[in-house]
Amino acid sequence: MTLIELCDNCKLPKSSTLRCRMNLEQARFNMVESQIRTWEVLDQTVLDLLLTIRREEFVPEKYRDLAFADLEIPLGHAEVMLAPKMEARMIQELDVRKTDKILEVGTGSGYVTALLAKLGGQVISVERVPEFSHAAMRRLAGHGLQNVQLHSGNAAEGWPTQAPYDVILLTGSVPLLSESFQQQLAIGGRLLAVIGESPVMTAYLVTRASANAFSSVGLFETSIPPLRDVKQPERFVF
């Protein structure tokens, strides 16, 4: 009996690898054109990056067929990969620059980490689930990204040991934004967080203008899973 090796991505025989790659690239192109452009992501640098970084390689194997679908993908431990359009919009709004020092709260699969690393100078990414950090480290190394520090820990109040940051991204929602995050921003730094409680949440961009001056702009309404271990606001009981 002759054993036929299957491609990890499409499950076709490896002899069909070229066809598999063409199918993947078409699916990636369709994701960008149909989902992401239509969600007001028009920055060409971001769009080109989404066509370059292979999202399917960051998706758990059993969900790989959904790598380009407009939905959240379960990672386990009550965490998800955000929908592609949400990831892209967050990246665009932060206007990441090559000199930026970036804090990512919630590494997850490592895909957004990879996008940030391609655009920025240095990325510090903190994840509460150690196995996610270990898996992300392997994936990022496979993409040749060496400007990332991965930490296992609780960054629900930020990561002050390496502050200040030019960019801070929270990949899960918070009911209220802790002031500690704002204090970890450099002057001119930008922070993006989805604030509120389901079903009503808003993505905000916070900019630090000076030592004591901050501006906040509501960007769009959405709903994403919460950041874990975040202090909940006090509630009145009548």
Q: Could you say what each language-model-derived stretch is?
A:
Residues 7-10, 20:
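Cysteine-centered motifs
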Residues 16-103, 111, 119, 132-134, ...:
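Class I SAM-dependent transferase core
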